[in-house]
């Protein structure tokens, strides 16, 4: 059965991935993802909001279903249309090859390594910018005097005594729970 013969009920019941397989088989040519979705919208009389969730699932299925092949530029076709050699040549991602450095290359003073030219450009960046705070000892001394005058400071010894007392109370509570 051709995809144009589908009724709205059939479109509602059938998965988009199966309809895409039928559509691509009928057309015998690669199609853009958005053209496939537009075809489904027109067949089912859908608005985009009506099928938004189905589109997400459809895209996931397209990528995972072995029957389909992304041939670039968001064009999709059926894997059956391509030989293994075609897939390896045209579709498989190319790997950029680099020369391997040997001992002679490492001794060559004119050889620039990756990233060396970027390091020189970073030299003009200031170590400190205007929006960063500076922590001078003189400022801290003024703050210490101000806090002492306000009687806000807790002596370090008092702080340790409080912490030890809390630990003992916690240990007593643990013994009680056992």
From Swiss-Prot:
Superkingdom, according to UniProt? Bacteria
Q: Which residues form the HTH HARE-type domain?
A: 14-81
GO CC terms for this protein? Answer: DNA-directed RNA polymerase complex
Q: Ranges of Acidic residues compositional bias?
A: 116-178
Query: What are the start and end residues of every segment in region (Disordered)?
Result: 114-178
Short name of one Pfam family for this protein? HARE-HTH
Keywords from the UniProt entry = DNA-directed RNA polymerase, Nucleotidyltransferase, Transcription, Transferase
* Biological-process GO terms, alphabetical: DNA-templated transcription; regulation of DNA-templated transcription
Q: Report the GO molecular function annotations.
A: DNA-directed RNA polymerase activity
Which protein family is it in? Belongs to the RpoE family.
Q: What does the UniProt record say this protein does?
A: Participates in both the initiation and recycling phases of transcription. In the presence of the delta subunit, RNAP displays an increased specificity of transcription, a decreased affinity for nucleic acids, and an increased efficiency of RNA synthesis because of enhanced recycling.
> Whom does it interact with, and what assembly results?
RNAP is composed of a core of 2 alpha, a beta and a beta' subunits. The core is associated with a delta subunit and one of several sigma factors.
**Full protein name:** Probable DNA-directed RNA polymerase subunit delta
* Species: Staphylococcus epidermidis (strain ATCC 35984 / DSM 28319 / BCRC 17069 / CCUG 31568 / BM 3577 / RP62A)
């Amino acid at each position: 059965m051709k995809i144009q013969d589908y009724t709205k009920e059939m479109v509602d019941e059938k998965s988009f991935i199966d309809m895409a397989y039928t559509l691509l088989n009928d057309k015998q040519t690669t199609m853009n993802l958005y053209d496939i979705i537009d075809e489904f919208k027109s067949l089912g009389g859908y608005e985009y909001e009506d099928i938004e969730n189905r589109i997400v699932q459809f895209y996931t299925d397209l990528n995972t279903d072995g029957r389909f092949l992304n041939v670039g530029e968001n064009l999709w076709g059926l894997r059956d249309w391509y030989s293994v050699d075609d897939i390896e040549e045209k579709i498989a991602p190319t790997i950029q090859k680099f020369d391997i450095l040997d001992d002679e290359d490492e001794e060559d003073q004119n050889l620039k390594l990756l990233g060396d030219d970027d390091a020189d450009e970073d030299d003009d960046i200031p170590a400190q910018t205007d929006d960063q705070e500076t922590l001078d000892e003189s400022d801290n001394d003024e703050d210490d005097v101000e806090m002492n005058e306000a009687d806000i400071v807790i002596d370090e010894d008092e702080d340790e005594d409080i912490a030890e007392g809390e630990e003992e109370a916690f240990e007593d509570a643990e013994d009680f729970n056992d």
